[in-house]
UniProtKB/Swiss-Prot annotation:
InterPro entries: Cyt_P450 (IPR001128), Cyt_P450_CS (IPR017972), Cyt_P450_E_grp-I (IPR002401), Cyt_P450_sf (IPR036396), Plant_Cytochrome_P450_Monoox (IPR050651). The gene is CYP81C13. One of its GO terms (molecular function) is monooxygenase activity. This is Cytochrome P450 81C13. It comes from Catharanthus roseus. Glycans are attached at residues 347, 362, 475. The keyword Signal applies.
């Protein structure tokens, strides 16, 4: 009997998929796409990273393409006009996120603002987070934390290189910097203490943090063929449950620590930064049913995933590109020396006076957007894009990678040319440059991210001389997990600039 039921379920699922794939609603005018196969749909066309495969298919079939992966329907867009239509006329329709096995298990039941359904709850949580963490006032109060943490990294690198030029694992140091900045602003503690940051203990801590927060949790075969999920295919879901338990334990520990400090009667100077957890707990006292610990943990999770590795990746790619383009590096150094001199370190108030630095960051994000496929959206009702019918429940992919490298939009798109941004008002360029997303679900932390990246990159170029390690092949190959990372971590030979010995010695 059990075998019959299993066979019946499998037969029904296959029949349903076959019907959807080969007998769609003939009245619908779906976007073009490649030939499909029974059951699997278009999965056989995805032989590289998804963003690269979609870019290749878009070159062949146009900037709006329709795909089916098993039982799920997808539309991928890569032209500014199609992207604009998605997030203006259809903005509310695409304001939701798709559900998947990963989001079922890893988002605290969809209550964080990145994955919560569009509506009043989402608006309240997002608005609260923006006001308490990303507002101009809050960024001003947290500025000392970012400046102290970059000084800590400079101090650590100087200790290693002050006697002679040494090889530096730059990815490690920028990751320590971004994690410590986020940890201090959210939880009033360090991820890695300075004395541990350059030794094995610090490296083990960073390895554990990456395992907790950056395990690949994209859609998988169980999302396309739900029958595999019922049978626990390859233990994928159980591994996600185990990962969630690790995350939950870590994040709950942060919340409990701040709660204990708060109950101890600690009084903060009104002008100093208040941690995000402390802000949430203050509101939890007034409305415990809304501001639950799970809500706090869900927001912390989003911050760690979206705010640490993305910034670190941008810094690492920028340094890699600068080492490959020494003329650009020298031009940036001249700008920094002219505006700041050699008597003090760069600080955040200097950033608006360094336009070429911002051009370099923009060009880095154009070539290597930290998230090449923006977080997916899902249509809440039938709609149209570029005259094509998009059914309700279709998952939307916005391919920033393809848009940023489109030769119709950019001259010599494969080349690193920061000067292309010198006379460009990015805000007026429409939808051709979208490294932080677009629409109602755009990243609220753009300003903080730019400050963090600008400060670190400016300080590295101001204080140290950098050279490519001879035996290290400086290439631009990449590895796509949650973010677009370098396939090989950047190692560079580093030595303090002679004029900055006095300043670095006094840090």
């Amino acid at each position: 009997m059990a075998n019959f039921i299993s066979f019946f379920i499998l037969f029904s699922a296959l029949f349903f998929l076959f019907k959807r794939l080969f007998f769609p609603n003939r009245k619908q005018k779906l976007p073009p796409g490649p030939p499909s196969l029974p059951i699997v749909g278009h999965l056989h066309h995805i032989k590289t990273s998804l963003y690269q495969a979609l870019a290749r298919l878009s070159n062949e079939y146009g900037p709006v393409i329709f795909l089916r992966f098993g039982c799920r329907s997808f539309v991928a867009v890569s032209s500014p006009s199609a992207i604009e239509e998605c997030f203006t006329k259809n903005d509310i329709i695409f304001a939701n996120r798709p559900k998947s096995m990963a989001t079922d298990r890893l988002t605290f039941n969809y209550i964080g603002f990145a994955w919560a359904p569009y509506g009043q709850f989402w608006r309240i949580v997002r608005r609260f987070t923006v006001v308490e963490f990303f507002s101009t006032n809050c960024l001003g109060k947290s500025r000392p934390i970012r400046e102290e943490e970059i000084q800590s990294i400079l101090r650590s690198i100087f200790k290693i290189t002050k006697m002679k030029s040494e090889k530096i694992d730059l990815k490690h140091w920028v990751s320590v910097f971004t994690f410590n900045v986020l940890m201090r602003t959210m939880a009033d503690k360090w991820a890695v203490d300075e004395e541990d940051s350059g030794v094995e203990k610090g490296k083990e801590i960073m390895k554990e943090l990456r395992e907790i927060f950056f395990t690949n949790v994209a859609m998988n075969v169980c999302d396309f063929f739900p029958i595999f999920r019922w049978f626990g295919y390859k233990g994928i879901e159980q591994r996600m449950i185990n990962l969630h338990n690790r995350r939950n334990e870590f994040l709950q520990g942060l919340v409990d620590k701040v709660r204990i400090n708060k109950k101890s009667g600690f009084v903060r100077n009104k002008e100093s930064h208040r941690s995000l957890i402390e802000a949430f707990l203050s509101h939890q006292d007034q409305d415990p049913e809304f501001f639950t610990d799970d809500l706090i943990k869900s927001v912390l999770l989003i911050m760690f995933v979206a705010g640490t590795e993305t910034s670190a990746v941008i810094i690492e790619w920028a340094m890699s590109l600068l080492l490959s383009n020494p003329d650009v590096l020298n031009k940036l150094r001249i700008e920094i020396d002219k505006q700041i001199g050699n008597k003090r370190l760069i600080n955040e108030s200097d950033i608006p006076k360094l336009p070429y630095l911002r051009c370099i960051i923009n060009e880095t994000m154009r070539l290597f957007p930290p998230v090449p496929l923006l977080l997916p959206h899902c249509s809440s009702e039938d709609c149209k894009i570029a005259g094509y019918d998009i059914p309700k429940g279709t998952v939307l992919f916005v391919n920033a990678w393809a848009t940023h490298r489109d030769p119709k939009l950019w001259d010599e798109p494969e080349k690193f040319i920061p000067e292309r941004f010198e006379n460009m008002e990015v805000e007026k360029e429409g939808y051709k440059f979208i490294p932080f997303g677009i629409g109602r679900r755009a990243c609220p932390g753009t300003s903080m991210g730019i400050r963090t990246v600008s400060l670190a990159l400016g300080a590295f170029i101001q204080c140290f001389d950098w050279k490519k390690v001879e035996e290290y092949e400086l290439n631009t190959s990449y590895d796509y997990r949650i973010t677009l990372q370098k396939a090989n971590q950047l190692e560079a030979s580093c030595s303090p600039r002679q004029d900055f010995f006095p300043i670095l010695s006094q840090l």
